[in-house]
């Protein structure tokens, strides 16, 4: 079950953190230039937190820069694993 409001707690990740996608991610139609349903990421892809935002005043959304793929994808905490904290 989804948390009622993640915003009561601090973000799980900070700008500069190195993270890994836990599972493959498909375009839900919000990523421009790539067909809906097409894979954006594979499980294990590594990226860096560029910024932290919110969605619906309930959830943190992390802008992850997947440098090797050349894309910036908004992801939720349950889709990511911390590999290395920012210095």
Which residues does each PLM region occupy?
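Basic/aromatic-rich interaction segments and small domains that mediate binding to polyanionic partners
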Residues: 2-87
